[in-house]
Amino acid sequence: MIEKVNMYHPDKVADRIAGAIVDYAYSLVPNPRIAVEVLVGHGHAAIIAESSVILERQVVEGIVGRIAGLSKGSVKLVQAPQDSHLAANQASGFRCGDNGVFAAKWHPGYERATTLAAEYGSIFIADGKYMFDFHRNAATICQSNATESDIRAVATEFENVTINPLGAWTGGTDADTGATNRKLGSDQPFCNPNGLHGKDLSKADVSISICVNAISRKLGGAFVKAYCSIGDEEVDLFVDGVRVGRLEFSEAVEFARSYITDLGGFEKFAEYGMRWDYEHD
């Protein structure tokens, strides 16, 4: 069973806002240091950004308006400089910004679920949450602002489909408050607690997570783990329990940079999490 939400789920709205703000920071300097937390719901958005760059309020308000449809008066923005100790750690180059344990185990069902969620999200421009059981050819589709007949017309590949168990619903940020990095189980094939969104590439949570998922996929679903401590310039890498060497963190950053660029940016990454719509070696 695989859970997936579409890009209009409140938590993904928060992720997309955070991702767009990170994109904005990268438009200002090549390697910003930024971490963004977003809480959005019921006509309000609260944003806290720890950043090495100054974010123009009107740009941030424009991002929130575009993604969440909120007016600029409903946005509370708090900016703070990056902690001096954390800044010093990255002053001379890319080094792991935190302790971390990362794991990935790719499987084709996740990619199929991601493709379906994106397809449904392109048809129903509204909050949606899905459960896919490809072994039983079954699905539970909770899709707001859509009729049962419209949903059944789309979900034709499943023999057993449960649609909106509680009946029709409206969803969105007026029904449920969204928060950054609260849908990590939907965003990667093997759930980890490492936050993927609202962070620059110097954060191991982002770069190492992307790398281990890519390695696992390339190896056909091997169980890949990585360990790092704050300040490390290399990361211990294990495949199916066997240590295979160390990965230069700077190389992980550049791989992740290329991945994010090819995908279309951090906002695009935030829509559906890890995805491989193209070949990236």
Task: List the model feature ranges, each with a label.
Residues 1-35, 270:
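N-terminal, positively charged regions that mediate nucleic acid binding
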Residues 2-8, 37-51, 140-142, 187, ...:
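Short glycine-rich or small-residue beta-strand-to-loop segments that form or flank ligand, phosphate
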Residues 38, 130-145, 174-192, 233-244:
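Short beta-strand elements
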Residues 38-44, 64-175, 271:
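Glycine-rich, mobile lid/loop segments that gate access to catalytic sites or pores
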Residues 56-76, 150-158, 239-266:
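A glycine-rich helix N-cap at a beta->alpha junction
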